Amino acid sequence: MSRLKKLPKQPEVNIGTIGHVDHGKTTLVEAITGVWAARHSEELRRGITIKLGYADAPIYKCSKCEPHQSYSTEPTCPHCGSPGEFIRAVSFVDAPGHEALMATMLSGAAVMDGAILVIAADESCPQPQTREHLAAIELAGVKNLVIVQNKIDIVDEKRALESYKEIIEFVKGTGAEGVPIIPVSAQHSVNIDAVLQALEENIPTPSRDPDKPPRMYVVRSFDVNKPGTSVETLTGGVIGGSILQGRFEAGDEIEIRPGVRVEKHGKTLYEPIFTEIVSLHAGGRKVKEAQCGGLVGIGTLLDPSLTKADGLIGNLVGKPNMLPPNRSELVLDSHLLERAIGTKELVQVDRVNKGERLLLDVGTAITVGSVVSMKNDIVTLQLARPVCAEEGDRAAISRKMAGRWRLIGYGIIKE
C-alpha cells in the first residue's frame, strides 16, 4: 500500500529505474518509496509499466549504525531507534521495460540525473531491453549509475553468482563498468539500505543554475476534476515535470511550447499557450517556489481539456518570450551506432536515406521526422509534430525494424 507523505524538502535529483520488462523496476521503486508507480488502469490490468511512473523518497542516515545499515527512508533508524539525519529527497522516474515502449523510456531519460539498472538474477544477462536501456541512457548523457541484481530470493546461490558474473561481463567497456552491483530482493525489501547507500555515493545532485531563465520539461499532464464537476468549480489543468534550470513561483506567467495544434487557412500549426501558475507541488506538499531538480506539479488556469490524458507531454515550459523557437525542421549532426540495439540478434545500422521516416526523442517530446537531405553526417528532417528545442540539444534516433522502433543513434541539433 502507498505510504505517500510529505518530504522535509523538495526532491533535488531524478533517478531513473531502467531495464528489461518484468525485472522488478516498479517493485524496487515501491520498496524504496512505498508508492506503486504504475497507477494507470491498463498497467494495473496487465502488470507492466506503460507510462512513466513517479514517486519520491527522503533519505536519512543514522550516525550510530554501520554502513550500509545506517541508510533508510525513515526519520527514526529502523535498527537502533536513533533519530536519523536528513540527507536529501529523491524523485524516481520508473521507465517501462517493454520493447514496444522504448520511445517512452527515452523521453524519461531526458529528466534523469542518474539511473538504477535493474537486472533479474533468474534470467540470463543481457536481455534485449537491458542492453537497449543501458545504451539509451548513455546516448542521453546520463553517466551516474547503480546496478541492482534483483530477485535473489528466487534463485539459489550458484545461479546468483552466475548472474553476477554475467553482469560483470555485460558491462565491460560500457559506462556501467565498475559501478556497484547490489544484490536485492525488492519483493521482500532485502538490501534496500545498501541501495540507498549506493545512490548517495554514486549519484550526486548535479549543480544547476537557479538564476537562469526557468525551463521545465513536461512529462505528465492531468485533468484533476471528477466527472460531473460544475463549470463554476472546475480546477485548471495540471502539468508535471522537472525544472532544468531557474525556478518558478506561484503567480508567475508562463509560456508552453510548442503548444496546441490549430488549423489555419487549411494548414496545421502549433501555437504556444500562455497561462498563470496558481499552485506548485513538490515532495508531496504545496510550495510557494519550485527549484531545479526532482519532480514538480504546476496548477494552472488552463482549460483542463488541454491537459487531460497527458495531452501536453513533450512541451517545454518557461517565462513568456524566453523559450527556444518551435522547430518543424531539424538539422542534426548524427552519430549512428554500429549495430541496432534491442533486437535479440545485433543488426548492423545502415546509413540514413532520403525519404526515410525516423522516430526522434527530443527532451520529453516524441515525434516522427522524414529525411529530406543527408550530407556526410548532417541529416535534415521534416517533423510531423514540431518540437521546442535549441542548438546543442540532443535527439535520440530510432528506426523501424521488423515492426518495432529500434534505437540506432543520436544527433546534436544544429541551427
Predicted features and spans:
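C-terminal effector modules of nucleic-acid-centric enzymes and ribosome-associated factors
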Residues: N14-T17, V155-E157, P304-E415
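Residue-level signature of catalytic and energy-coupling elements of molecular machines
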Residues: D22, L28, G47, D94, ...
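Conserved Switch II/interswitch segment of TRAFAC-class P-loop GTPases
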Residues: I87-S91, A95-L101, A109-H133, E138-E162
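P-loop NTPase switch module centered on the Walker A-proximal segment
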Residues: S2-A103, M112
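Helix-rich terminal scaffold detector
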Residues: P8-G34, R88-S91, V111, L117-I119, ...
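Conserved catalytic-core segments of large NTP-driven translation/proteostasis enzymes
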Residues: L7, E169-L312, L316-K319, L323, ...
